[in-house]
Amino acid sequence: MSKYDSHLKCSFCGKSQEQVRKLIAGPGVYICDECVELCNEILDEELIRPDGPMTKEPVRPGNPKTRTSLKELPKPMEIKDYLDEYVIGQDEAKKVLSVAVYNHYKRLSLVQGKNDEDNIELQKSNILLMGPTGSGKTLLAQTLAQVLEVPFAVADATTLTEAGYVGEDVENILLRLLQVADLDVEEAQRGIIYIDEIDKIARKSENPSITRDVSGEGVQQALLKMLEGTVANVPPQGGRKHPYQDCIQIDTSNILFICGGAFVGLERVIEQRIGKKSMGFVRPGEGQSKEKRAADLMQRVEPDDLVKFGMIPEFVGRIPVMAALNPLTEETLVAILTKPRNALVKQYQKLLNMDNVELEFSQEAVKAIAQEAYRRKTGARALRGIVEELMLDVMYELPSRKDVQKCMITKEMVEQRSTSELLLHPSSMVTPESA
């Protein structure tokens, strides 16, 4: 036997048994310890690549980037100050968010430190944002993630369906967060997930449905464990899970979920409840405009109102922190155009400045844009659409022209939208004298 053993070689690199530390035998093949180590390195590199195949848990070295210690964690007032730089108005919602997020990551630092002597367990408090479209719900959640330097993912509740039906599984929400975290499971488990259009998965009535509601109550049921905290199996390539697929395990106990929705009609539920308590007296909000009355009513929302709206009680119980955002006024829209750090006017001024052209919006033009956006009833989202329409011809022509120093956007351009004005206005500016 020893006669043949001396001639054993690695089937991959060709090294003999004497040249390596260990030679592993298989049915008709041999592999040395050096080739095994090389294979492990190749697999690890594939796991780290965002487009590479994944197994159960990607191996990631290093310390987490998230601010989890109390010393690094910004205080509620600091969080609100940061939000003020990017989001105009909504002061009450900002305070609620700042306190809730600060307490959430305080809880996370306590869990990681594991030095609590009195064994008091702090429960997670997910957040519900209610407000009309374009009022800043997504932007608030996104800005929170920026100040805390944590992974942030956005999901649309309307695309989710109950397991076993056509559509996305709720676990695909976690996959988006994992991808944003560069496949770092530990980092993803400290992130923030914003679930938009959460009001669209309300069941059709307060009473439990006899028929299946696969994109309503069924999705709420599927989200319960994820919101509360569970170890979820996430399919690495997305889509439906199947028995022979390797899944990544993610613990959602420390992921902060922020749910947002317009909740159109919820104010009527609140008004009905309040009206019953104030029978014989002046109705709340009487004499106010419809929008103002609806906004005031939303500030008085209670969990029972959400249940009557169509959210199941178990779901409402897992989002204890609620904040209502006010609809945007014309004055607020004017401020949104000009004041935030990344205001639309500043963005377009920077774009034209790269072509050596100065861009200026007259105050009357800004007001006219805000008035048109207010009429569209889509909040701040309407602003970008209007400015894009205004600037299209200007930004098409100016890069090819070298004689324009300044571009002025006037009230007439906003109101008339004539192509001739947009093209002729830059040419009326002072141009450098030809040599």
Swiss-Prot record:
Keyword Glycosyltransferase among UniProt keywords: no
InterPro entries in alphabetical order: AAA+_ATPase (IPR003593), ATP-dep_Clp_protease_ClpX (IPR050052), ATPase_AAA_core (IPR003959), Clp_ATPase_C (IPR019489), Clp_protease_ATP-bd_su_ClpX (IPR004487), ClpX_bact (IPR046425), P-loop_NTPase (IPR027417), Znf_CppX_C4 (IPR010603)
Superkingdom of the organism of origin: Bacteria
PROSITE patterns noted in UniProt: CLPX_ZB
A GO cellular component entry from the record: HslUV protease complex
Annotated signal sequence range: none
Subunit structure: Component of the ClpX-ClpP complex. Forms a hexameric ring that, in the presence of ATP, binds to fourteen ClpP subunits assembled into a disk-like structure with a central cavity, resembling the structure of eukaryotic proteasomes.
Record domain ClpX-type ZB: where: 1-51
SUPFAM superfamilies: Glucocorticoid receptor-like (DNA-binding domain), P-loop containing nucleoside triphosphate hydrolases
Encoding gene (name): clpX
Family in the record: Belongs to the ClpX chaperone family.
Function of the protein: ATP-dependent specificity component of the Clp protease. It directs the protease to specific substrates. Can perform chaperone functions in the absence of ClpP.
The keyword Metal-binding appears for this protein: yes
Residues binding ATP: 132-139
Residues the record lists as binding Zn(2+): 10, 13, 32, 35
Gene Ontology BP, a term: cell division
Any one GO molecular function term: unfolded protein binding
Keyword field: ATP-binding, Chaperone, Metal-binding, Nucleotide-binding, Zinc
Protein name: ATP-dependent Clp protease ATP-binding subunit ClpX
Pfam families: AAA_2, ClpB_D2-small, zf-C4_ClpX
